[in-house]
Amino acid sequence: MSDSPASPAPLHAQIDWDDQGLPHSRHYDDVYFSREQGIEETHYVFLEQNRLRERFAALAPHECLTIGETGFGTGLNFYCAWQCFAEHAPAEARLQVISVEKFPLTHIDLERAARLWPSLAAFSQPLLAQYVAVHPGFQHFSFDGGRVTLTLLIGDVLEQLPTLDARIDAWFLDGFAPAKNPDMWTPALFEQMARLSAPGTTLGTFTTTGWVRRALMAAGFTLRKVPGLGKKWEIMGGTFTGLPVDGVSSAPDAPWYRRPPAASGPRRALVIGAGLAGSATARSLANRGWQVEVLERHAEVAQEASGNPQGVLYLKLSAHGTALSRLILTGFGYTRRWLTNLQRGRDWDACGVLQLAFDAQEAARQAKLADAFDPSLLTAVSRERAEAIAGVTLPAGGLFYPEGGWVHPPALCQAQITHPRIQVRPHHQVLRLARVDGLWQAWDGDHLLASAPVVVLAGAADVRLFDGCADLPLKRIRGQITRLPATEDSQALGTVLCAEGYVAPPRAGEHTVGASFDFHSQDLTPTAQEHQGNLELLREISEDLHARLTRDGASSDSLQGRAAFRCTSPDYLPIVGPLADRAAFDERYAVLRKDARQVPDLPCPWLEGLYVNSGHGSRGLITAPLCGELVAAWVTGEPLPVPREVAQACHPNRFALRTLIRGEPAARRR
């Protein structure tokens, strides 16, 4: 995918509240819902026309119904759909709602709107509790133990829907009236709805405008008019019957990025590795009704890179819409919502992150970011303002990320992996996998440890021990952190400070300072030399804070810390998704060596049931939880929680593809 400048960050909805306490869009000069019959209209137009009550009741165990919506607005339709699902669906069924919103409400406005419907408080309050870090792109929410998910696509509907990889069962064709918002109600929108639908997909909409009706029919929907409610004479329901012969259909994905068949049979999986990636993957599968065994070679979870006392929720973004930047924005929001399950102050803290403009090049980079993103995500601050935020003297101003902070990674791992359908098996080191009678067997030498139809490799660079991953260009980078006892003076630090290194406010009486980068050493014994290097990184961040933390004159020989390996890929994107047989891949797509424009229509030789979640580098706190959801979506055939282009940019097959196109031999790395 080619990188292009990011669209300006969408502003929040500009709302006026009338004398009755109802919201009115200033931008569209239109109401969000009927003044007289808001809830009744939602039930009639969207729930009844899509027959949701009956369809929810008919769902099989673990079956998922997916709703697509154009215009999230105040969330009323979502609350009503969730309520209907909760009242009528079997206990093990699931609901996914995917909703586009160009101008999301602020938390204050969303909360004010929710107070209008006290009968829906059981459904609005969980959303309000998680309604943080809602920024452009895909924003993924999980409720009721993962039984209900919401993915908000923040941005213009004609930019967002083309990036969605999903199959929609029911459409809420909502939004401001066509006369007020003509840019949305276009044939291009209806063509995207058709692309995402299957025969039998239903829709409900309040509009019966003639050109809307004709454009929907041209896209493959059969429509019916039905009497409306109140002042609305008529509304429409419909069913997708298939694209007409001359309909517009999008080109299919290249075979190496198409989905493998969704897993069938027993819902059992093995996850190898109990760090951030493994625990997140296990939880995402367990939330979908899978029994998961986590095989961990250590005595406890989070013993390698995920075991540091503090990690930073820091967004290293691009001012352009790169795949990595989009992944970071989506992952940051998902992690921040996950953290609401943990104890603030002990397990994490939203104290913000201040990235110092430590030289002219960094200052120029930050200026571009400040122009590209909304101030709710990041804002440029002067040196004086930065010092007021930090509570210590600083050499420069920088960018402040108010929603950032620090996390105790072992606490996040433990929270993710604690689930009745997850069993952690410590001291289980998997050395070999074998596929026998439709099951993957995990072996430790001659000892069979466990077996299941699905295996997810989440052991950082050690995934290269196994077929399907042996050729992945993962590299290990040693990093060492230093733990400094907090002093009375250092307690003033009010935010995470970052430059070439970082320092966090105290947790459990200690600051974490880091981290070194060593591309050569394979020894994880902490060294005095690297402790001294971390102290120098601290000095560059703040001479003042350095003095406050080192006044007792402790030598670097006596300092405490730990070292671990980061695992990263050449393009700095994680490696997430289904794995293919590399030899068969090279043979099947060998024509690419001669002509990269060829796209052979040959199915990818998948290693059935084998997946990977690795290569998160120093961004695991932001990317690993979301990528657990991405793996689960690949496994189950559900909608992907990230844009299709981002999922492909993270796909394991990207490296085999590049090797073929460049005519390079595959280099197995063991």
Regions found by a protein language model. Give the residues of each.
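S-adenosyl-L-methionine
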Residues: E111-P162
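Helix-loop-beta segment of a Rossmann-like dinucleotide-binding subdomain
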Residues: A121-S124, A319-H320, G345-Q355, R383-T418, ...
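N-terminal Rossmann-like FAD-binding beta1-loop-alpha1 element of flavoenzymes
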Residues: R267-E293
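Glycine-rich FAD pyrophosphate-binding loop
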Residues: N287-S306
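Dinucleotide-binding Rossmann-like beta1-alpha1 core, especially the glycine-rich loop
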Residues: G311-I389
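Helical element adjacent to the flavin cofactor pocket in flavoenzyme catalytic cores
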Residues: L399-G445, A450, V454, A458
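Flavin-dependent oxidoreductases
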Residues: V436, W443-D444, L448-E536, E540-G561
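C-terminal catalytic lobe of FAD-dependent flavoproteins
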Residues: L549-R670
